[in-house]
Curated annotation (Swiss-Prot):
Name the record gives this protein: Iron-sulfur cluster insertion protein ErpA
Record text on cofactor binding: Binds 1 iron-sulfur cluster per subunit.
GO CC terms in record: cytosol
Quaternary structure note: Homodimer.
Short name of any one Pfam family annotated for the protein: Fe-S_biosyn
Family: Belongs to the HesB/IscA family.
Entry function: Required for insertion of 4Fe-4S clusters for at least IspG.
Annotated positions binding iron-sulfur cluster: 42, 106, 108
A GO molecular-function descriptor: 4 iron, 4 sulfur cluster binding
Needed cofactors: iron-sulfur cluster
Length: 114
């Protein structure tokens, strides 16, 4: 998908830069960052991240700076309007999902409820 099209999920420059760096470390240019939602955590749902070299039927792929973010259709329905970012600070370095659909989140921000 093009950067010019309004996307249901934003993939920030900071996140794309970090993914590019991590993929270079793995020496596998086919890898993409997959973000997904699974049951669990203290609020009912939690975010997960993994590298994947497969894009499954129905997955949405967002390309930015030569790297891809992949989301399965089930997870995407909970992430519409959100963003995937990367931050470095006092709490450490991590990918962060900003999700306008979450009614509440836990203190660490890793789990949420809808």
């Amino acid at each position: 998908m093009s950067d010019d099209v309004a996307l249901p999920l934003q993939f920030t420059d900071a996140a794309a830069n970090k993914v590019k760096s991590l993929i270079a470390d793995e020496d596998n240019p086919n890898l993409k960052l997959r973000v997904y939602i699974t049951g669990g955590g203290c609020s009912g749902f939690q975010y997960g991240f993994t590298f994947d070299d497969q894009v499954n039927e129905g997955d949405m792929t967002i390309e930015k700076q030569g790297v891809g973010l992949v989301v399965d259709p089930m997870s995407l329905q909970y992430l519409v309007g959100g963003s995937v970012d990367y931050t470095e600070g006092l709490e450490g370095s991590r990918f962060i999902v900003t999700n306008p659909n979450a009614k509440s989140t836990c203190g660490c921000g890793s789990s949420f409820s809808i």
